[in-house]
């Protein structure tokens, strides 16, 4: 191999390693995981192929309605599809007994007629839960059916180079929109929900979620990247609840806080009263024991004086005596 050819090969590898891979969905690594690929349109499917993206694209599996399914040898025992006939538009790839070597980027490429090529890139990362590591900066509450506008304004002074909006869920992050303001490129999202966004130079970045439903609730992240290397992140939590406006939600939270405070005060009062009663009872018992101890040596009674008159007692013991005697006749005796 001559020097120019070697240099071009090294340059190609360097660009492949350094170039940022734009993904549509990010999922955490697991031994048994699924990479979702659902084609939104109803065109005629001609071929589907899964790749793992690295320095080059390694083919994992390929399906054709005419020739059937072929899974490449390194993945034959580790991946499968639920719908073996591929009659539907769901081309989700399932892993069994995956290893850390399976962390990386995957591409699901569909070829349809007459729409053409449709591609989705999925990133597999080492993470337990996405929501747990992302605190929110603000909270927005809305009723179903309304249009919700999410806005982030950078504090950086450098010109913004790229803006990325994401929806964060516990087991998945979906890219909503990506704007490269330097090259004027808008990365097409594969998110099944319609999102309206502006991709223009300015101090604000805005997305609009029309006709929101309860399923739109969650965390939304705005990621701003400056040309000087500075980055800023804003996270907003959206709650879509039936019949609850911002004021009603605030009243609900305030009422719950007041009830919780009253409950804590009641419990504290009961505990204080119980401790005071217990303390008084212990003091009373201690005083009684001390009094009995002091009184025990003088526990005697004065003798009753016999010289004192007992008239009252004698009077009380006097009783009337009744005698039964025969009745004698009062007639005079007859003299002889």
Curated annotation (Swiss-Prot):
The lineage of its organism: Eukaryota, Metazoa, Chordata, Craniata, Vertebrata. Residues 19-126, 135-239 form the Ig-like C2-type domain. This is CD226 antigen. Residues 19-254 are extracellular. GO terms for cellular component: cell surface; external side of plasma membrane; membrane raft; plasma membrane. The modification Phosphotyrosine is found at residue 322. GO terms for biological process: cell adhesion; cell recognition; natural killer cell mediated cytotoxicity; positive regulation of Fc receptor mediated stimulatory signaling pathway; positive regulation of immunoglobulin mediated immune response; positive regulation of mast cell activation; positive regulation of natural killer cell cytokine production; positive regulation of natural killer cell mediated cytotoxicity. Keywords: Cell adhesion, Cell membrane, Disulfide bond, Glycoprotein, Immunoglobulin domain, Membrane, Phosphoprotein, Receptor, Repeat, Signal, Transmembrane, Transmembrane helix. Disulfide bonds join 37-108, 152-222, 179-199. Residues 276-336 are cytoplasmic.
């Amino acid at each position: 191999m001559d020097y120019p050819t070697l240099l071009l090969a090294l340059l190609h590898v360097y660009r492949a390693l350094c170039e940022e891979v734009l993904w549509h969905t990010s999922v955490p690594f697991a031994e048994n995981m699924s990479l979702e690929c659902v084609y939104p349109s109803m065109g005629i499917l001609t071929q589907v192929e899964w790749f793992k993206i690295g320095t080059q694209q390694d083919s994992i599996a390929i399906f054709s309605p005419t020739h059937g399914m072929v899974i490449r040898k390194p993945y034959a025992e580790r991946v499968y599809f639920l719908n073996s006939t591929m009659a539907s538009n769901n081309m989700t790839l399932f892993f069994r007994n995956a290893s850390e070597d399976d962390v990386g980027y995957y591409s699901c490429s569909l070829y349809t007629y007459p729409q053409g090529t449709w591609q989705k890139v999925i990133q597999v990362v080492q993470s337990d839960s996405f929501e747990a590591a992302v605190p929110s900066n603000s909270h927005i509450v809305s009723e179903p059916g309304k249009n919700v506008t999410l806005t982030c304004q950078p504090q950086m002074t450098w010109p913004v180079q790229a803006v990325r909006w994401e929806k964060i869920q516990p087991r998945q992050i979906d890219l909503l929109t990506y704007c490269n303001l330097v090259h004027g490129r808008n990365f097409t999202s594969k998110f099944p929900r319609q999102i309206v966004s502006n991709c223009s130079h300015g101090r604000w970045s805005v997305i609009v979620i029309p006709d929101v439903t309860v399923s739109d609730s969650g965390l939304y992240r705005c990621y701003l990247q400056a040309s000087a290397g500075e980055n800023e992140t804003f996270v907003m939590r959206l709650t879509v609840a039936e019949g609850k406006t911002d004021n009603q939600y605030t009243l609900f939270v305030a009422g719950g806080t007041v009830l919780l405070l009253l409950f804590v005060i009641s419990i504290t009062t009961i505990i204080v009263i119980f401790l005071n009663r217990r303390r008084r009872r212990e003091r009373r018992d201690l005083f009684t024991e001390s009094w009995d101890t002091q009184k025990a040596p003088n526990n005697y009674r004065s003798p009753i004086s016999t010289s004192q008159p007992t008239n009252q007692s004698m009077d009380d013991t006097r009783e009337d005596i009744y005698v039964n005697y025969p009745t004698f006749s009062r007639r005079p005796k007859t003299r002889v």
